[in-house]
A protein has these predicted regions:
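Conserved beta-strand-loop-alpha-helix junction that forms the acyl-donor binding cleft
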Residues: 9-13
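Conserved active-site tyrosine of GNAT-family acetyltransferases
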Residues: 16-21, 92, 119
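Conserved catalytic-loop position in the HRD/HxD motif
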Residues: 84
């Protein structure tokens, strides 16, 4: 058994698709009209046949209060792996992405948290013992 799909709840599918592809660098895998909304998935360009992220409309009545509660408490909705948190932080910040947490070492990982502009906080994380600022170890 393996994970095939994961979802992130978004308040605007077009805006989310632009952010997740043009800013974060994912690739569109599916964009299928389904009535009022679309079935949109994005994938990592490094693993186009891997896990797909569904840009799911947050229209269910429970979705917005759930997202608001997570966001107001500073809790990321999901996390993405990166090779170097500091480099991604610098790249994304230069593109205007707002971060709620700068790169921070948390035990064996370094993390940062960004706002995806669609109602979610997203954590980026770098595994291993290499501090984001020192570039040593591994």
């Amino acid at each position: 058994m393996r994970i095939n799909l994961a979802s992130v709840l978004v308040d605007d599918q077009d805006k989310a698709l632009r952010f997740y592809t043009e800013i974060l660098g994912f690739q569109t895998k599916h964009d299928v009209p389904m009535g009022q909304f679309r079935w949109i998935t994005v994938v990592s360009p490094e693993d186009p046949d891997g896990t797909e992220l569904v840009l799911e409309p947050d229209e269910h009545p429970a979705a917005k209060p759930f997202k608001d509660a997570l966001s107001s408490d500073g809790i990321p909705f999901t996390a993405f792996a990166v090779d170097n948190v500091q480099a991604e932080f610098d790249r994304l910040q230069a593109l205007g992405v707002r971060f709620t947490q700068e790169p921070t070492e948390m035990g064996p990982v370094t993390t940062a948290v960004l706002d995806d502009t669609c109602g979610n906080l997203i954590q980026i994380q770098q595994a291993g013992s290499q501090p984001a600022s020192e570039g040593s170890g591994g």
